[in-house]
Amino acid sequence: MFKKLCILLIFSKLKVNKLLIDKYRMHNLYAIFAKLLNICKQIAGNLVNESGNVPRRGFVPKFSDLEVVALNMASEAVGIDSESLLFAKLQEYRVEIPNLISRRQYNDRRKITSSLCNAIRERMVSKMDGGEDYFCIDSKPIEVCRIARSKRCSMGKKDFSKAPGVGYCASQSMYYYGYKLHAVCGLSGVIHSFDLTKASVHDIHYLKDVKVDYSNCTVIGDRGYISAQVQLDLFETANIRLEVPYRCNQKEWKPTFPAFAKARKRIETLFSQLCDQFMIIRNYAKDTDGLFARIIGKISALTILQYI
């Protein structure tokens, strides 16, 4: 089993990785938008109707749902993190995009189409990385505001189940107020699944969702996922082998298998890219739906760039 992992890691190094952003070669925002829209149309299939909208009652918008999704991905792909800056640049393409909606409408519809955006992302993942046997799991803190301002934060006031919380980040040795992003990726660096929880939720609780979505595979994590009871439960219920490094003072200590340590760097590299290129730690959202839509848009933009 470990021999197969070593071979996969060797092939992943030999493979030439494409540039994950085209803004250095393609400065035209409309050209990027048109290219991503064409890909979304090919992948969406039965998710939308002929006009590119999710079937629903009421007025049929001229600027389709697929165009909203593609515009969201295009803006994130070129590093435009502000809606104000995005619509300032879109004024140059009024002729190419005659049915362009207003900024307020775009903000509302981006939240509505976030589920469509995630469904398209999942289809791209299945086409790129559908037969993986090894996965990496990790979490990333998403800070909403400073702890001193947490009582004045209006995010999640209407629904406490979606409200942020106070958590501790061991890698940065700090407490923060916000959420925790849990993600599972393959050896090729494609994020298969992710979720947002309160910052106070322990990493090991996300394995309950992993047990439902995955089976007959190996999941590689860090020391935050150490639990003999959880390891046994995953193996007995879904035949998932959870591999985590031992603590230095742990009984029956064993050295970490080098291939597991190298494989775990995949998801750490992804989190670094999401922070630097896609600026995932920035927060302009005023409510939880807006924040969740931003996270989905950034991860979907990363996935479609990998797909290209």
Model-identified regions with their sequence ranges:
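Short alpha-helical elements
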Residues: 1-308
